[in-house]
From Swiss-Prot:
The chain crosses the membrane at residues 40-60, 99-119, 126-146, 157-174, 187-207, 216-236, 258-278, 297-317, 328-348, 354-374, 391-411, 419-439. Its main location: membrane. Keywords: Glycoprotein, Membrane, Neurotransmitter transport, Transmembrane, Transmembrane helix, Transport. It comes from Danio rerio (Zebrafish). It is a multi-pass membrane protein. This is Probable vesicular acetylcholine transporter-A. Residues 1-39, 120-125, 175-186, 237-257, 318-327, 375-390, 440-513 are cytoplasmic. It is found in: Membrane. The gene is slc18a3a.
Length: 513
């Protein structure tokens, strides 16, 4: 009897394992479906961007109060009864907070040119996994840090992780969604996650810090980051057999930087984000001084702006699908809205009035970002090689310039010139830059480059000479010609016996730029 029962249990277990194996196989096949895989990749990238921006902003209500608590005892003993020293200590503390907040963007700004080139060489999946791993470590350090130096290290490490994860994630979306309307929609979804992470993180961090302590918000984010990394490792399989050698060589980042169209887009991305980057560290003190705002009002200042940001993304995606040739106009309109809203901010007398221009700023940023990020990919497609790591590293650099300067420079400007002058200057800069986007008005009419390299790699051979040329390139490293007769070729890829060689410029079709 016991033998029969054990045999039945073994048979049942075998059936269960077989069913589980079959389901796992079906799941694997479903994941390998190209359309499903694109959606999963979009989810992975969006979660990575959400985490990065939540970690960027979640420290706003936590770190200043936590550092003040750590330093209060030593400062109390040192400055008791000495107001001049107390003022100096407060100024130094504000500077420390500003440098801590800016350190992430500064390191990200410095590393991005290198990560862009690295992404172009190895692909998008490995850098994304590297970025998620670094962000996980950074978040754990934040959770257990107990002094300024450790917090500074964690913040800087986050910048390194962001340089990998943000750039590779956006570039991967541009690569997977090659059709313009799909690309615009996918990048719009990514921007919505970025916005939600930035605007929802301060109240998320503030509430959890108040009721669960400093560690819990960071541990929660670290768990989500770990899950996203495991999903990336499972779905993308970044360390499986590589095929990068079959892909085109990306355009060097310095060449992309001097492209006038890409430079105009990069300048617009920097300029439109300056109001947000400069207002975030300064608006709380201004609200306390001018409208006696309560702490809960300061905490949710930017939360209502999430909804117009989503509206701006949605409208731009819909309009771009219907009128793709007006992308430059959507960006210019967004910059004008940002400029007007920035100028209105100092005129607000209460919290309810302030919500309106802040919503205008975020609505305008949504228009600019959603219109111009797909434009960068299109410019690379038609003017360079369709590899997107370096061009989105330039976009990330543009954002980092604004957010590196904001926490350090904004407070100094307010102190020396005033809050009104800061907002008028930011508004004027956006309005004056908007006409520069007229340079992009004919971008939609550009034709893809038909240089020899693009033609051979992307379109295949179109004639006898092109066929021979392509075969020569494929066998060049072996030292043989395409005919298989072991005829040596020289270092330029031409037959050694030829008296005349041709350069790429002489043999390629003209580029339409």
């Amino acid at each position: 009897m016991a033998t029969e029962e054990s045999g039945g249990l073994a048979q049942t277990a075998a059936v269960k394992l077989s069913e589980m194996g079959e389901r796992t196989k079906q799941l694997g096949n479903a994941i390998q479906d190209p359309e499903r895989q694109r959606r999963i990749i979009l989810v992975i990238v969006c979660v990575a961007l959400l985490l990065d921006n939540m970690l960027y902003m979640v420290i706003v209500p936590i770190v200043p109060d936590y550092l003040a608590h750590l330093e209060s005892e030593s400062e109390q003993a040192h400055v008791k009864g000495n107001s001049s020293i107390n003022i100096t200590q407060n100024e130094n503390f504000d500077l420390q907070i500003g440098v801590l907040f800016a350190s992430k963007a500064i390191l990200q700004l410095l590393v991005n040119p290198l990560t862009g080139t690295f992404i172009d060489r190895v692909g998008y999946d490995i850098p994304l996994l590297i970025g998620l791993s670094i962000m996980f470590v950074s978040t754990c350090i934040f959770a257990f840090a107990e002094n300024y130096a450790t917090l500074f290290m964690a913040r800087s490490l986050q910048g390194l992780g962001s340089a990998f994860a943000d750039t590779s994630g956006i570039a991967m979306i541009a690569d997977k969604y090659a059709e313009e309307s799909e690309r615009s929609r996918a990048l719009g979804i990514a921007l919505a996650f970025i916005s939600f992470g930035s605007l929802a993180a301060p109240p998320f961090g503030g509430v959890l810090y108040e009721f669960a302590g400093k560690r819990f918000p960071f541990i929660a984010l670290a768990c989500v980051c770990l899950a996203d990394g495991i999903l990336c490792l499972t779905v993308l399989k970044p360390f499986s057999s590589r095929t990068r050698e079959n892909m085109p060589v990306g355009t060097p980042i310095y060449k992309l930087m001097i492209d006038p169209y890409i430079a105009v887009v990069a300048g617009a991305l920097t300029t439109c984000n300056i109001p947000l980057a400069f207002l975030e560290p300064t608006i709380a003190n201004w609200m306390e001084e001018t409208m006696n705002a309560s702490q809960w009002q300061i905490g949710i200042t930017w939360l209502p702006a999430f909804f117009p940001h989503i509206l701006g993304v949605y409208l731009t995606v819909k309009l771009a699908a219907k009128y793709p040739h007006l992308q430059w106009f959507y960006g210019a309109l967004g910059m004008v809205i940002i400029g007007a809203s920035s100028c209105i901010v100092p005129a607000c007398k209460n919290f309810e009035q302030l919500i309106i221009p802040l919503c205008g700023v975020c609505f305008g940023i949504a228009l600019v970002d959603t219109a111009l990020l797909p434009t960068l990919a299109f410019l690379v497609d038609v003017r360079h090689v369709s590899v997107y790591g370096s061009v989105y590293a330039i976009a990330d650099i543009s954002y980092c310039v604004a957010y590196a300067l904001g926490p350090i420079v904004a407070g100094k400007i307010v102190h020396d010139l005033g809050f009104v002058q800061l907002n008028l200057g930011m508004g004027l800069a956006n309005v004056l830059y908007a006409p520069a986007l007229l340079l992009l008005r004919n971008v939609s009419l550009m034709k893809p480059s038909h240089s020899e390299r693009n033609m051979l790699l992307e379109e295949g051979a179109t004639g006898l000479y092109d066929t021979i040329r392509m075969e020569e390139r494929q066998r060049k490293k072996h030292g043989y010609s395409s005919s298989g007769n072991c005829v040596p070729i020289d270092e330029n890829g031409t037959f050694a016996g030829q008296s005349k060689s041709f350069s790429e410029e002489e043999t390629s079709e003209p580029e339409y730029i």
